[in-house]
């Protein structure tokens, strides 16, 4: 059985989130949660919340052994960017893109 959770429009950069997501792919859920809990950056906290949500979704399914769940796949896609302007010297302005991410975590039973 598979369990999934999705977080959309999260205010973290997709590029930085993929760096953290690559580390938990294929790990048992308990190990992945420990790794994310002690990783000191913003994408780790967001991924931790999505992983907890996927685990809670798995607990709602009958006949699923939550202790044997592994992270099957972590997908980080780019969401829409917020465009902002930063004032510069002599009346100029620079555009800043505040990027967002769509994050999906898929858990599966068994060892992979």
From Swiss-Prot:
CDD domains: Ribosomal_L22. This protein binds specifically to 23S rRNA; its binding is stimulated by other ribosomal proteins, e.g. L4, L17, and L20. It is important during the early stages of 50S assembly. It makes multiple contacts with different domains of the 23S rRNA in the assembled 50S subunit and ribosome. Disulfide bonds: none annotated. Keywords: Ribonucleoprotein, Ribosomal protein, RNA-binding, rRNA-binding. The keyword Ribonucleoprotein applies. It comes from Nitratidesulfovibrio vulgaris (strain ATCC 29579 / DSM 644 / CCUG 34227 / NCIMB 8303 / VKM B-1760 / Hildenborough). This is Large ribosomal subunit protein uL22. Belongs to the universal ribosomal protein uL22 family. InterPro entries: Ribosomal_uL22, Ribosomal_uL22_bac/chlpt-type, Ribosomal_uL22_bac/org-type, Ribosomal_uL22_CS, Ribosomal_uL22_sf. Part of the 50S ribosomal subunit. GO terms for cellular component: cytosolic large ribosomal subunit. The lineage of its organism: Bacteria, Pseudomonadati, Thermodesulfobacteriota, Desulfovibrionia, Desulfovibrionales. Pfam families: Ribosomal_L22 (PF00237). HAMAP family: Ribosomal_uL22_B. One of its GO terms (biological process) is translation.
């Amino acid at each position: 059985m598979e369990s999934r959770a999705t977080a959309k429009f999260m205010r973290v950069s997709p590029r930085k989130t993929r760096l953290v997501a690559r580390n938990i792919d294929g790990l048992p859920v308990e190990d992945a949660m420990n790794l994310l809990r002690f990783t000191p950056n913003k994408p780790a906290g967001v991924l931790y919340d999505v992983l907890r949500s996927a685990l809670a979704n798995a607990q709602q399914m009958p006949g699923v052994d939550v202790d044997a769940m592994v992270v099957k796949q972590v997908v980080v896609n780019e969401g829409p960017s917020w465009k902002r302007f930063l004032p510069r010297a002599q009346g100029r302005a620079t555009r800043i893109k505040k990027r967002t991410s769509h994050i999906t975590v898929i858990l599966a039973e068994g060892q992979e």
